[in-house]
Amino acid sequence: MKLVEVKHPLVKHKLGVMREAEIDTKKFRELATEIGSLLTYEATSDLETEKVTINGWNGPVEIDRIKGKKVTVVPILRAGLGMMDGVLEHVPSARISVVGIYRNEETLEPVPYFQKLASDLEERLSIVVDPMLATGGSMIATLDLLKAKGCKHIKVLVLVAAPEGIKALEAAHPDIELYCASIDSHLNEQGYIIPGLGDAGDKIFGTK
């Protein structure tokens, strides 16, 4: 599995602000989008381009253009919605596929409850977004679902990842790419990432 921890100063600064205990919903939501945008920039750096000729202001000019790769952004409900717009800033024509999976707070196991996926998944790059990679259960279940529908090319973007989740994800899906803003220390007994961000979904939606 390709693992990239994006260490750009802007990413580190913005993530540091998100860790503040008293951060308000508006600021947390804005920063989730901004870091999602920066992670997308990094994750799409290997997209193929081709030369095409267009009519410029002074006649024909040869330019680079993305080589017809279809993209779908896949937010995992509900917290993943907080990073979706960051992806769409760079790939505004991307289709949106939605997967609903929540974590049982007692067993920590993923429980699927909803899916609405783009067509032709086998032809698309799926960019899966979720702020936290904790145990990895929800992410693994989502990737299982996407692959069952024919998806072959997957990149995962998360704000914060725990070593335990990274290990589990690599064991289950070694062929995917994972981009994160930080690899944190560990999971606590409740399955939360330490130091982490707290409950990202509650902070994005203002329900904490």
From Swiss-Prot:
Catalysed conversion reaction: UMP + diphosphate = 5-phospho-alpha-D-ribose 1-diphosphate + uracil
Gene Ontology molecular function: any one: uracil phosphoribosyltransferase activity
Binding residues for 5-phospho-alpha-D-ribose 1-diphosphate: 78, 103, 130-138, 199
This enzyme's EC code(s): 2.4.2.9
Pfam families per the UniProt record, alphabetical: UPRTase (PF14681)
Cofactor(s) needed by this chain: Mg(2+)
Alphabetical keyword list: Allosteric enzyme, Glycosyltransferase, GTP-binding, Magnesium, Nucleotide-binding, Transferase
Highest taxon listed in the record's lineage: Bacteria
UniProt cross-references to PANTHER family, sorted A to Z: ADENINE PHOSPHORIBOSYLTRANSFERASE (PTHR32315), URACIL PHOSPHORIBOSYLTRANSFERASE, CHLOROPLASTIC (PTHR32315:SF4)
Name listed for the protein in its UniProt record: Uracil phosphoribosyltransferase
Gene transcribed to yield this protein: upp
